[in-house]
């Protein structure tokens, strides 16, 4: 299972998204910090429009060092594109956790993944977020693996989840969201 990427400056965005679909990829990954655009940049509106109701969008979110990917920038996007399925990488806001929680609280079409975040987010805080917003809104490692799977699984296990929560986070949520069978 993979995701494709596009850039808002492309002159062929519609064709780019159609290529992602025709290749059998299951969503679009955007990294505002590396690709040098803000989540709410007007140039991204066409991407969100093309993906709404068709492809989940995995967004690099957070990092207090940059303003491109602050989860607060999602607010107008999630208000406009209510059918857009947005996954905030790094628990929705690496190093700006409260902003991610605000988005989870306000928008049912926003969920998070665990990649490259559980080393910095305490197991207690991760568990609090999972219990507050539901395990159905958390997915394991849909983004780039900074650490080994073994290390990431150990971090998941340190959260003391129920068996149902663990299964949902590790694979059931991704299977449902990205449309593959178990």
Mark where each language-model region is.
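Residue-level "edge-of-site" marker
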Residues: 33, 63, 169
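Catalytic pocket-lining loop regions of alpha/beta-barrel enzymes
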Residues: 26-27, 37-139
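Short glycine-enriched loops at secondary-structure junctions
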Residues: 7-10, 63-64, 93, 145-146
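Conserved, mostly hydrophobic/aromatic
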Residues: 20, 28, 51, 90, ...
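Mid-to-C-terminal alpha-helical segments outside catalytic/metal-binding sites
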Residues: 15-19, 23, 135-139, 150-182
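Flexible, active-site-proximal loop/turn residues at the rims of small-molecule/cofactor binding pockets
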Residues: 34, 116, 144
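Mid-domain alpha/beta scaffold segments of enzyme catalytic cores
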Residues: 1-46, 110-111, 150, 177
């Amino acid at each position: 299972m993979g995701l494709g990427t596009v850039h808002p400056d492309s002159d062929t965005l519609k064709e780019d998204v159609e290529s992602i679909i025709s290749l059998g990829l299951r969503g679009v990954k955007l990294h505002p910090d590396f690709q040098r655009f803000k989540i709410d940049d007007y140039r991204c509106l066409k991407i969100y429009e093309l993906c709404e109701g068709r492809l989940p969008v995995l967004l690099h979110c957070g990092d207090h060092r940059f303003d491109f990917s602050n989860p607060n920038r999602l607010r107008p996007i999630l208000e406009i594109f209510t059918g857009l399925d947005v996954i905030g990488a790094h628990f929705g806001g690496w190093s700006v956790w409260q902003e991610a929680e605000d988005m989870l609280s306000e928008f049912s079409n926003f969920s998070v993944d665990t990649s490259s975040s559980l080393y910095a987010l305490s197991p207690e805080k991760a568990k609090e977020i999972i219990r507050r917003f539901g395990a159905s809104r958390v997915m394991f490692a849909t983004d780039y693996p900074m650490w080994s799977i073994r290390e990431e699984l150990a971090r998941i296990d340190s959260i003391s989840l129920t068996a149902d929560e663990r299964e949902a986070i590790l694979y059931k949520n991704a299977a449902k969201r990205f449309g593959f069978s178990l």
